[in-house]
Amino acid sequence: MSSLPWLTIIVLLPICAGLLIPLFPNEGNKIIRWYTLGICIIEFLLITYIFCCHFRINDQSLQLEEDYNWIDLINFHWRLGIDGLSMGLILLTGFVTTLATLAAWPVTRNTRLFHFLMLAMYSGQIGLFASQDILLFFFMWELELIPIYLLLSIWGGKRRLYSATKFILYTAGGSIFLLIGALTIGLYGNNGPLFDIQSLATRSYPIALEIIIYSGFLIAYAVKLPIFPFHTWLPDTHGEAHYSTCMLLAGILLKMGGYGLIRINMELLPHAHAIFAPWMVMFGAVQIVYASLISLNQRNLKRRIAYSSVSHMGFVMIGIGSLTNIGLNGAILQMISHGLTGAALFFLAGTSYDRTRTLFLDQLGGIAISMPKLFTMFSIFSLASLALPGMSGFVAELMVFLGIVISQNYSLTFKIVITIIEAIGIILTPIYLLSMLRQMFYGYKIPNTLALSLIDSGPREIFISLCLLLPIIGIGLYPNLVLSLWNSEVEYILSQY
């Protein structure tokens, strides 16, 4: 047992360090950048230390628990704890946020506010994955909204205000349902308010009430994940946001929805989840194909990648709805895998825009010769996104695929139909990704004079790309590297079904 409140330290360190940024001179962009990057590295090293020295793999019980009374009147506690599921996502958060901070190096406008918002997001993301109080979970969920809104509305593209407004309306609207669900589940019963997630997991509810609560939570998570038809904010947001913000959105923010589905809906409301599971599988399968077809018709590079994210989240839904060990493990692995590949693709799309000053695929072409390093990295991560064997996406999608096939909860006809739809989506994925590569890097659309003046990726960009690539290959070759983290938690959750 550790004597230090490690989880509180890693939750509060980024935002507390961010509060010191206004003390730096506004002209000292380089100082602010190095300071923020240093805080992110220290935070990630602390997370790694906690994982290596204080976390016990294959232990399904809650670890490093902390419980501090916060608001007596409503029994609101600062209650933190981690297990394998949350530890994996906390590691992903630390890794991607550190690289996103390095990716934001070219930002020179309002750097103090920009880097403070990055650190505030960092705290909110870590806090959400470590929360063991459902009101604290909601608080951390909401902590993300304002930083992203400001990052989008100030440093976004030409339609940034429209995209930022759409984002805040969708996510704030979904958050209302999350708050109502949290209050309903916490105030149910005659023993006073109870918001401790571990205690709530032992409660039972009337099936009608459980379905109502589940529906409210599902709407909130459907916006974040996102699930069709609550996905339309995502392409607009990605299309206008700075690519470092896109890395955080694709790498971490979408995973908050999947985490909520598993941690809250599956664990606290198993009877309702069993009822909703077939619908999640059906919507997930349709979403894979629908988003793939829409992605194929996108002229904007970042919007095409955004719709590919929507498609990949369909596999997460199928895995969660399969109610099998291999399927749920595959869904979690898909979240980790997409967190890496999605962040990498948006980063490379942003670096491409920095050089060509366009995101429209029909205005690109012929830049492979002048930028071979960018071409090579873009090709590798596109192959990773389409689940090339030997990379993490292949293992994740294969596990989800097998999870629905071996599931004993569905009829043979249902499984055949879902499998066929999944297969169609798997076929469509390389079509829109490889056509994206063809339109960007082959042909002669960019004038030769411009093509010759384009500067290839530098050391910073290559370093970020390699950092994202190594875990993708490592997990693809040896998936037990991460599957062992949360397998015991998956077995515990599925024991209720």
Swiss-Prot record:
It is a multi-pass membrane protein. InterPro entries: NADH_Q_OxRdtase_chain4 (IPR022997), NADH_Q_OxRdtase_chainM/4 (IPR010227), NADH_UbQ_OxRdtase (IPR003918), ND/Mrp_TM (IPR001750). One of its GO terms (cellular component) is chloroplast thylakoid membrane. It comes from the Eukaryota. Keywords: Chloroplast, Membrane, NAD, NADP, Plastid, Plastoquinone, Quinone, Thylakoid, Translocase, Transmembrane, Transmembrane helix. Its EC number is 7.1.1.-. It catalyses: a plastoquinone + NADH + (n+1) H(+)(in) = a plastoquinol + NAD(+) + n H(+)(out); a plastoquinone + NADPH + (n+1) H(+)(in) = a plastoquinol + NADP(+) + n H(+)(out). The keyword Kinase does not apply. This is NAD(P)H-quinone oxidoreductase chain 4, chloroplastic. It comes from Angiopteris evecta (Mule's foot fern). The lineage of its organism: Eukaryota, Viridiplantae, Streptophyta, Embryophyta, Tracheophyta. The gene is ndhD.
